[in-house]
Amino acid sequence: MAGHTENEITIAAPVDLVWDMTNDLERWPELFSEYASCEVLSREANTVTFRLTMHPDENGKVWSWVSERTADREKLVVRARRVETGPFEYMNIVWEYEETPDGTRMHWTQDFAMKPDAPVDDAGMTDIINRNSPIQMALIRDRIEEVSCTTP
C-alpha cells in the first residue's frame, strides 16, 4: 500500500510573490522550520537539483537527501521527486498554486511508498506528513504575508 497526502492553505498574497518565494530554494531554511540548509546542486532550464538537510531529530539524527524540482510557471505547478530516496521507495510531490479572491491557494500532493526496513510504514509516514505539512504551510503563509504587507 502506498501513501498519499493532500494539504493546502490560502496565503493572503499575490500569486507572483507566493510563487517566487516558495521557489527560491536557497531561502527554504527561512520559510520552513525543519530545514537547516538547502544547497542547489544544478539548474537546467526549469529543473533544479538540490540537497536538503534537516535539523537534527529528537534522537540527534540529521536527515539529508537530494531532490529534483521542475517548475512550470505558466501552469503554476511544480513537480518534485527525491533522487536520493532514503527510507522511501519513492517520493513524489506536486505543488499547485491558484489565484483566489483571498490571495493564493497553495496545494501539496505527496505520493510515496516506504521501504520495508524504513523506521515507519506508509500509514505512519502519512500521519507524520499530515501532522507536519499544515505546520510548515502556516509558517510559509505567515512569512509570505509578512513580506506582502511590507511590499508596495
Curated annotation (Swiss-Prot):
Q: Which Pfam families match?
A: Polyketide_cyc
Classification via InterPro entries? COQ10_START (IPR005031), START-like_dom_sf (IPR023393)
**An example Gene Ontology biological process:** antibiotic biosynthetic process
Q: In which pathway does it act?
A: Antibiotic biosynthesis; curamycin biosynthesis
Task: Report keywords, A-Z.
Answer: Antibiotic biosynthesis
Highest rank taxon of the organism: Bacteria
Q: Which family does it belong to?
A: To polyketide cyclases.
According to UniProt, the name of this protein is Putative polyketide cyclase
Name the species this protein comes from: Streptomyces cyaneus (Streptomyces curacoi)
Question: Gene behind this chain?
Answer: curF
